[in-house]
Amino acid sequence: MRNMFADAPRTSLTAIYWAFLLYLLLPLTLMMAMSFRDANFVAFPIGDWTLDWYAKVMQDKQFLEACLYSVMIAAASTLAATTLGTWIAMLIVAEGIKGQVIIFALACLPAVVPGMISAISLRIFISTIDMPTGTAAIILGHTVHAVPFVVVMALTRLRSMPGNLVDAARDLGADSIVAFFRVTLPYLGPALVGGMIFCVLLSIDDFVRTFFLGGYRPTLPMLIFAKVQGGMSPEINAMATLVLVVTAAVGLYAEYMTRRARTR
């Protein structure tokens, strides 16, 4: 009896875990299953299965253009966020810099501000400086949102870096720039790769900032949102499934790179 009561918390936590996992995976599983339905509407039972919806999606010019546009924005914002985030991380760990805690707090602020508030404030900002909505504004918004993640990952890596590596490079005659590119940057490599992948995922998935800052060209989330307004269909499920598979693969690779950065 005593053992039964002792195991009760563990059993409850296990049940909660599996219930939560089911809550997360069941909608995704249903979405993927519906993408194979051989009909123009979503309903149970699925009936006949087909790959026609995937073929239609891959021939959809709007979908392909939205994918390319999303990738372009993700690449630009990732490059900007990685450069800025790395510089901020090095500023935080540098000697003789005052207010490092404040710098870190301000750098991480975009990650905790609600997306709606961030989008509205950015829209007000670009209106103030007479910057038109569109590609540049979207890249700015995605960069601001992604910088904190690069800062945290780069900072974690920098704090584990032996200080004698840079000192040894300087003793051998390297200046600060050469030491950075020959020593610091290679050491930061795994963390930066993981941070860049997270930036790509954040950018491709970002809907709120894109909605407020975008122009007439739709990104992938905007296109799917527009299609959903006309009702759910297996075509939309096929689009979402393709995005899910790609982002899941990229996310798993990012997790691998993060673990590698922590263990090296």
Locate predicted features.
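Transmembrane-helix boundary motif in ABC transporter permease subunits
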Residues: M1-A8, A75-A107, I124, G163-N164, ...
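C-terminal transmembrane helix and the adjacent membrane-cytosol boundary/short C-terminal tail
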Residues: R2-A15, L155-R170, S176-L185, N237-R264
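Membrane-interfacial helix termini and adjacent extracytoplasmic/periplasmic loops
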Residues: N3, V42, I46, L51, ...
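Interhelical loop and adjacent transmembrane-helix boundary motif
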Residues: N3-P9, A39, Y54-Q62, I204-E255
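Transmembrane alpha-helices
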Residues: I16, Y23-L28, T143-V144, V151-R157, ...
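Periplasmic/extracellular loop-to-transmembrane helix junction in inner-membrane transport proteins
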Residues: N40-S77, Q229-G230
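Hydrophobic alpha-helical transmembrane segments of multipass integral membrane proteins
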Residues: L64, L68, M72-L84, I88, ...
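Loop-to-helix entry region at the N-terminal start of transmembrane alpha-helices
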Residues: E65-M72, S121-V150, G189-A191, M196, ...
